[in-house]
A protein has these predicted regions:
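N-terminal intrinsically disordered, cationic/polar leader segments
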Residues: 1-100, 107-131
């Protein structure tokens, strides 16, 4: 299944950003920042799919801010190879496409959170899919 992606020439496009400022944490409270990703693959036409990656940053307990960012890319595919995939999302999770998307989204989120209460949130440039 190595030939699913026909053309590695693509341009990631920012789809959506949702930043919500929340209340300050309680004094001496421990705040854990939860980070996770979701991926979606949808067919655009017979020879192309759209791959989107959404990264969520949510503090626990809910305070400071909440961020959700989605970036996507149109990928030209080999139709026969793609149609033979058992799970397209699982394929793209481990493809170079996911690495490009996550690297772009990490940079966007670091810039977006520069002026937050915690300063820039630098998240790992690897996809973090829930198990």
């Amino acid at each position: 299944m190595a030939n699913v992606i026909r053309n590695m020439n693509f341009k990631p496009i920012l789809e959506k950003i949702n930043y919500e400022r929340l209340s300050e944490p309680q004094p001496n409270a421990n705040v854990n920042v939860q980070v996770w990703d979701e991926m979606n693959v949808s067919r655009l036409r017979s020879d192309a799919v759209k791959v989107t990656l959404t990264r969520f940053i949510k503090p626990d307990p809910s305070c400071l801010f909440s961020v959700e960012a989605t970036i996507g890319v149109e990928v030209i595919i080999n139709t026969a190879e793609y149609d033979a995939l058992e799970d397209a999302v699982e394929y793209f999770k481990t493809s170079p496409i996911s690495r490009v998307l996550v690297n772009n989204i990490v940079t966007i989120l670091a810039n977006l959170t520069t002026h937050s209460q915690l300063g820039p949130i630098i998240t790992a440039p690897v996809c973090q899919f829930p198990q």
